[in-house]
Regions:
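Polytopic transmembrane helical bundles with strong interfacial aromatic enrichment
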Residues: 1-184
């Protein structure tokens, strides 16, 4: 029971940042959707880019603290796991237990979050983002915001929204797995 305060801290850390991330996502989305129609087209590009970058920053912060919370949970409940991870037979023995299966699922879920974020942000978004040089001139920015490019910008925002929702769902799953892991 001496490990209980650390375990509680790990769980609270994850819950806090899930709630924080959800709130930030809702706030950014609501602010963007209600305000973007009142902004002149040349400035919409800057605002879209600013909202996008802030949402991505919040996403990576959330992932960082999800990793910290997961590592803290694993350290508290399986303190010898890191030293045993170098020995394949001992690691297999740990992963064959119910707690080991939950730990493996938690690691897989966290890695999926990282891969999903990396794929969206490093592969998909660069193809849909507004070129920086186009932002420097209002006339070029206005020309860039044709119907085709508006569709691309909206597709990027939609992708970030789906990514954010996926992070919220996966983050909640990781928290549930952490609770199960600590109670088995």
């Amino acid at each position: 029971m001496s490990d209980f305060p650390l375990l509680l801290a790990a769980l609270m850390l994850r819950v806090f940042f899930l709630v924080l991330f959800t709130g930030a996502y809702i706030w950014f989305s609501a602010a963007f959707l209600t305000g973007i129609g009142r902004v002149p087209p040349p400035q919409r590009i800057r605002i879209t880019r600013a909202v996008t970058s802030r949402m991505l920053l919040v996403t990576w912060t959330f992932l960082l603290f999800a990793l910290i919370g997961g590592a803290l949970t694993a350290y508290v409940t399986e303190s010898g796991l890191i030293s045993e991870a170098t020995n394949l037979s001992e690691l297999t023995a740990i992963l064959s237990t119910p707690r080991g299966i939950i730990l493996a699922l938690e690691v897989v879920v966290t890695l999926l979050m990282i891969l999903l974020n990396a794929a969206i942000q490093l592969i998909y978004l660069p193809r849909t983002s507004v070129p920086i040089e186009e932002l420097e001139s209002p006339t070029k920015g206005f020309k860039w915001l044709s119907s085709k490019n508006t569709g691309r910008a909206l597709a990027a925002i939609r992708a970030i929204s789906y990514l954010s929702l996926a992070n919220i769902i996966v983050g909640a799953i990781a928290i549930v797995l952490g609770v199960l892991y600590s109670h088995i």
